[in-house]
From Swiss-Prot:
Protein known as: Nucleoside diphosphate kinase
Organism this protein belongs to: Exiguobacterium sp. (strain ATCC BAA-1283 / AT1b)
Keyword set includes Metal-binding: yes
Lineage: Bacteria, Bacillati, Bacillota, Bacilli, Bacillales
One Pfam family per UniProt: NDK
SMART domains cross-referenced by the UniProt entry: NDK
Catalytic activity: a 2'-deoxyribonucleoside 5'-diphosphate + ATP = a 2'-deoxyribonucleoside 5'-triphosphate + ADP; a ribonucleoside 5'-diphosphate + ATP = a ribonucleoside 5'-triphosphate + ADP
Location within or outside the cell: Cytoplasm
Keyword Cytoplasm: yes
Residues of the active site: H115
InterPro entries per UniProt: NDK-like_dom (IPR034907), NDK-like_dom_sf (IPR036850), Nucleoside_diP_kinase (IPR001564), Nucleoside_diP_kinase_AS (IPR023005)
């Protein structure tokens, strides 16, 4: 069965959207395997956004992601990577359709409530990155 990484970003946590987001995926029949709330380190945030390292907004992304707790999750189910991307909606809130998570809750391009892996390969990399970070916080 396919797995993906989903993360409720600091703005979604602050706004109390964790339950709403989890419910949407549970209602689709997907299985939540792992969930951890953690405030990301700068190193993990930089690794997460590595493909944007040379872009002018990279520092802003890292600063935002490390500004508070996030909810890191591993979800499993048939075609979950593709379906979760449809459920999440477009990155820019103005382009996100009503009924998608971003269409319903996102306010700006950077504060868009949720991250979801965009491919199976990205999911594997992100799950390894984020759950290694979580494990390092367990004493």
């Amino acid at each position: 069965m396919e797995k993906t990484f989903l993360m409720v970003k600091p703005d979604g946590v602050k706004r109390g959207l964790i339950g709403e987001i989890i419910s949407r995926f549970e209602n689709k029949g997907y299985t939540l395997n792992r969930l951890e709330m953690v405030t990301p380190s700068v190193e993990v945030a930089e690794a997460h956004y590595a493909e944007h390292k040379e872009k002018p907004f990279f520092g802003e992304l890292v600063e935002f992601l490390t500004s508070g707790p996030v909810v890191a999750m591993e979800w499993e189910g048939e075609d979950i990577v593709a379906v979760s991307r449809l459920m999440i909606g477009k990155t820019k809130p103005v382009d996100a359709q009503p009924g998608t998570i971003r269409g319903d809750f996102a306010s700006t391009m950077s504060q868009n409530v949720i991250h979801g892996s965009d491919s199976v390969d990205s999911a594997e990399r992100e799950l390894s990155l984020w759950f290694a970070e979580v494990a390092s916080h367990v004493s």
